[in-house]
Amino acid sequence: MKYTILSLVAGALISCSAMAENTLTVKMNDALSSGTGENIGEITVSETPYGLLFTPHLNGLTPGIHGFHVHTNPSCMPGMKDGKEVPALMAGGHLDPEKTGKHLGPYNDKGHLGDLPGLVVNADGTATYPLLAPRLKSLSELKGHSLMIHKGGDNYSDKPAPLGGGGARFACGVIEK
């Protein structure tokens, strides 16, 4: 009996450690023109057979749907553009390793790899709905980049406005290597 229980516990621990290897957690902070702001929560990313699953645990956000992307650089620092300090500009653009130059959303393989489904924020300012990114298969594809939340929605097109017509960068998290 002792050995059976010990075997079950050991098996459970091995399973948990294997699951931990297939997830990563990204701390998200307000993106400010003066630098990184307050922590607003975290996003857990898990590998699934269907793509990467992004599970937000965020608060203090504006209700509605917001553009959500993987950006090229592992930075959330501001940068200068047209003489103005822009929040999280050092994160670069949407992850686009194939250099498509097209914003076509998470389901079209001819656009940015970093285009993710829209982030849904509840009326109370929390975001908890998981998002599936079917084109991203491995956590290694994310490492050394950043996650970005934009003000406003995303139409998954470059028309009528570039990059889905989303607004300013307002939350960012660096994905460590």
From Swiss-Prot:
GO CC annotations, alphabetized: periplasmic space
The enzyme's main class, written as a single word, is oxidoreductase
Compartments annotated for it: namely: Periplasm
Q: Any idea of its EC number?
A: 1.15.1.1
Keywords of this protein's UniProt record, alphabetized?
Antioxidant, Copper, Disulfide bond, Metal-binding, Oxidoreductase, Periplasm, Signal, Zinc
Residues binding Zn(2+), per UniProt: H94, H103, H112, D115
Where do the annotations place Cu cation binding?
Answer: H69, H71, H94, H150
Cofactor(s) this protein requires: Cu cation; Zn(2+)
Q: What does the record note about the cofactor?
A: Binds 1 copper ion per subunit. Binds 1 zinc ion per subunit.
Give me the reactions it catalyses.
2 superoxide + 2 H(+) = H2O2 + O2
Give me the disulphide-bonded residues. Answer: C76-C172
Q: Which SUPFAM superfamilies match?
A: Cu,Zn superoxide dismutase-like
Query: Which N-terminal residues, if any, form the signal peptide?
Result: 1-20
How is the quaternary structure described? Answer: Monomer.
* Role of this protein: Destroys radicals which are normally produced within the cells and which are toxic to biological systems.
Question: Under which name does UniProt file this protein?
Answer: Superoxide dismutase [Cu-Zn] 1
Organism, scientific name = Salmonella typhimurium (strain LT2 / SGSC1412 / ATCC 700720)
User: What taxonomic lineage is listed for the species of origin?
Assistant: Bacteria, Pseudomonadati, Pseudomonadota, Gammaproteobacteria, Enterobacterales
